[in-house]
């Protein structure tokens, strides 16, 4: 079966061995080959520094690899008008597949009016916006900005906008269920539910949560497979997804068809 991982990073994270960006890219490609992952979508960050490459750097380092696509991170504090115009140009040229907001990491609600130009741009080019929800990797994140219920306002006010709620809003998965059920323009990825590898107990626990999600919101036409590599182990995540009790058609929707349609891959 085709596999699209819609949520990976090429950042260097504290506590891991530092590798130059080119070597990180090769590590991602090797990990994909080992897991039979056909395509990955690389997300740039809400800030640029030696550990977090810019969208432009990611475009450059992945341009030789047809199995890697880019989603551009955008922030209120870390990006300016010139950065925004670059995103427009990259969308026009087909170099990025969508936009990503990091609510919680930066302390603004997703319905802050300063994000509206990002939503308008995504609507104009027919691409999704991905929005961080739930727990943050850093303790400096502020969780009230990352609650999935905040996405409801964006979905209602922008009915033509395709929104991907990252991480199922974990730990507020039940609230994310309602946002998805209510808003037909809202989707969610299952990435980043664990740091590192799943333990047997936690794997069963999260599988039950995903099952409950599906039972509440219906057919998984709105769920996308993603890992959050390298924060989450790709092989462990693939094993987790394989154990989800899904009919073949539903599994295909989760593992590649939904992402294929949303990101036009």
Write out the residue ranges for each language-model feature.
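Mid-to-C-terminal alpha-helical segments outside catalytic/metal-binding sites
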Residues: 1-10, 19-39, 218-222, 232-265
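Active-site neighborhood of phospho(di)ester-bond hydrolases with catalytic His/Asp-centered motifs
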Residues: 3-6, 41-44, 71-73, 100, ...
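Conserved, mostly hydrophobic/aromatic
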Residues: 7, 32, 58, 99, ...
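Histidine-centered divalent metal-coordination motifs
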Residues: 7-13, 132, 167
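Acidic/histidine-rich helix-loop elements
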Residues: 10-23, 136-138, 197-198
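Active-site gating/metal-coordination segments in enzymes
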Residues: 38-39, 49-145
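Short, well-ordered alpha-helical microsegments
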Residues: 51, 172-176, 234-235
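Catalytic pocket-lining loop regions of alpha/beta-barrel enzymes
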Residues: 94-98, 111-224
């Amino acid at each position: 079966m085709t596999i699209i991982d819609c949520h990976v990073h090429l950042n260097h994270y504290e506590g891991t061995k530092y590798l130059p960006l080119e070597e990180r890219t090769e590590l991602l490609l090797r990990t994909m080959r080992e897991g039979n992952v056909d395509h990955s979508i690389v997300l740039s960050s809400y800030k640029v520094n030696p550990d977090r490459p810019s969208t432009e750097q990611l475009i450059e380092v992945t341009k030789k690899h047809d199995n890697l696509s880019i989603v551009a991170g955008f922030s209120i504090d870390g990006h300016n008008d010139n950065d925004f115009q670059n995103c427009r140009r990259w969308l026009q040229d087909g170099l990025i597949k969508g936009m990503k907001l990091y609510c919680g990491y930066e302390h603004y609600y997703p319905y802050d009016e300063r994000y509206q130009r990002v939503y308008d741009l995504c609507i104009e080019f027919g691409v999704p916006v991905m929005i961080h929800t739930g727990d943050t990797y850093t303790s400096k994140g502020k969780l009230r900005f990352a609650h999935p219920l905040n996405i409801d306002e964006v979905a209602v006010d922008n009915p033509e906008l395709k929104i991907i709620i990252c991480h199922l809003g974990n730990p507020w998965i039940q609230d994310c269920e309602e946002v998805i059920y209510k808003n037909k323009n809202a989707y969610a990825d299952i990435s980043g539910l664990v740091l590192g590898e799943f333990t047997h107990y936690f794997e069963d626990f999260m599988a039950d949560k995903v099952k409950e999600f599906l039972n509440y919101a219906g057919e998984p036409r709105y769920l996308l497979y993603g890992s959050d590599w390298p924060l989450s182990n790709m092989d462990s995540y693939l094993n987790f997804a394989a154990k989800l009790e899904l009919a073949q058609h539903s599994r295909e929707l989760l593992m590649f068809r939904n992402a294929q349609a949303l990101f036009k891959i």
